[in-house]
Amino acid sequence: MKNHMKKILVIGETCVDKFIYCNVNRLSPEAPVPVLIPIRTTSNPGMAGNTSANVTVLSPKSVILGLNQEEDITKIRYVEEKSNHMFFRVDEGETNTLPFRWTAEVDVMLGEADITIVSDYNKGFLSNADLKEIAYKSKLSILDSKRRLTNDVIEDFSFVKLNELERINNPELINDNIITTLGSRGAEYKNTIYPSPKPQETIDVSGAGDTFTASFIIKYHQLKDERVAIKFANRMAAEVV
C-alpha cells in the first residue's frame, strides 16, 4: 500500500517582494530627506507566495496546491544595508485585483487537501462569504487575515492567526482557537504566553508571520498538539527575522 502524500492548499494573494538595499550616508541638499544609493537587489515570493515557499521547505514531500489572484503585485522596499531599517515601500499592481471564483475544481481541491492555509491580505481577492465557505469545506484550516473580522467569518476555521495589532483591532472576536503573535515576545494562545527563543527587538521586513502560520499548522497536523506546534512555529519565525 502506498503512503498517503499530504496535500496542502494555500489560498490568498501573492506578490513579489523586492528589497533594494542601499547605503545612506547623507541628506539631500534639496530637501531634508536621505540620499539612498542602491547596492544590491533581492526578490522572493511574498504574501501567500511566501507561505507556499515556507510550506515547500517545511513539508518537502507534500503536494502544494495554490489558488491566487491573476494580477501581478510587487512590493518594493528600500532598506538601509547596515541597520536593515526600511525607509519606504512602493506597491505596484494591487488596485485591480479580480475576485476569487468558485469552480468545481476548487471544491475538489478543498475536499482533497489535508491542510488549507488562507493568507488573506484584504486586497479584494477573497470576500467574507469566500472565507466562510473555505472554512466550512476544509478538513484542517488556518486563517491569517489582515481584514476586520467577525465571529461568523472565523467560526469554522480550525485556527486563526493574528498579530498583536490585529487582535487589538478585533476585540469582539471570541473564537478559542485564535493565536496571537507578539513579535519578539513570542505568541499567546488561550491566555498562555509562549516566549520567543530570540526575544530581542528586531526590524522585520521578512514575512515572519507567514513562516509562523505555515510552521504551526504543519506541525499541528503532524502531532495534534497546539503547544508543541506554537513553540515550533516560534522557533521557525525567529530564524527568518
Positions of the model-derived regions?
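Conserved beta-alpha-beta core of the PfkB/ribokinase-like small-molecule kinase fold
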Residues: 25-27, 31, 78-96, 115-172, ...
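Short hydrophobic/aromatic-enriched beta-strand-loop microsegments
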Residues: 62-63, 158-164, 194-196
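Active-site metal-binding loops of divalent metal-dependent hydrolases
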Residues: 13-14, 121, 211
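Conserved N-terminal subdomain of the carbohydrate kinase-like
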Residues: 6-11, 16-117, 128-130
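Conserved phosphate-binding/catalytic region of the ribokinase-like
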Residues: 112, 129-140, 145-156, 169-241
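Glycine-rich beta-alpha junction loops
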Residues: 14-16, 68-71, 94, 147, ...
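Generic beta-sheet signal
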Residues: 11, 65-67, 144, 163, ...
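A short acidic-Thr-Gly-centered motif at the start of a beta-strand
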Residues: 1-5
